[in-house]
Regions:
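Extracytoplasmic/periplasmic terminal helices and flexible tails
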Residues: 94-101, 106-119
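Active-site environment of divalent metal-dependent phosphoester hydrolases
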Residues: 89-90
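Active-site metal-binding motif and surrounding structural segment of the metallo-beta-lactamase
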Residues: 73-79
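Short beta-alpha junctions and helix-cap segments that line functional grooves
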Residues: 29, 93-94
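Phosphate/adenylate-binding glycine loop and adjacent helical scaffold
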Residues: 84
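Short C-terminal domain-edge/linker segments immediately following a structured domain
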Residues: 33, 62-65, 79, 110-117
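A structural signal for short, hydrophobic beta-strand segments that form beta-sheets
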Residues: 32, 39, 78, 104-108
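Feature for secretory/organellar precursors and membrane-associated catalytic proteins
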Residues: 1-72
Length: 119
């Protein structure tokens, strides 16, 4: 797959897909779920993502029961909570700290899928 992203300093918004340098030093693609100053909580029983006490309506994936935050996490003034769209197999803000804007290298605006070839 080929991913095209913009390095412009546009405003980051919820549901933006971003290219970032994660806390583990790897470059990853994640979706912004929580914005600076918001409180994020993931319910242990249902996997429901809550932002400032309200259920987040998601079109991009669901968080599985058992992948949660033990406590509500309030994001700092330059922190973003990110999740992978493949929640079942993603290392993201559930595993490492929220990311700062300096870790976000660009907003993805197009993904070109490679064709699978039969071999």
């Amino acid at each position: 797959d080929l991913v095209l992203c913009s390095r412009s300093s546009g405003t980051l918004q919820r549901n933006d897909t971003v290219l970032l340098e994660a806390g583990n030093g790897q470059t990853q693609i994640k979706r912004i779920i929580g914005l600076p100053g918001e409180q994020v909580y993931i319910d242990r029983r249902t996997g429901t993502v809550m932002i400032d006490g309200r259920e987040l309506e998601e079109d991009f994936g669901t968080t599985l029961p058992g992948t949660y935050l033990d406590y509500p996490l309030t994001l700092g003034t330059d922190e973003y909570f990110v999740l992978g769209d493949n929640r079942e197999d993603s290392e993201d803000s559930r595993n490492y700290d929220p990311v700062s804007s300096s870790q976000i290298k660009g907003i993805i605006y197009m993904t070109l899928r490679s064709r699978k070839t039969d071999s």
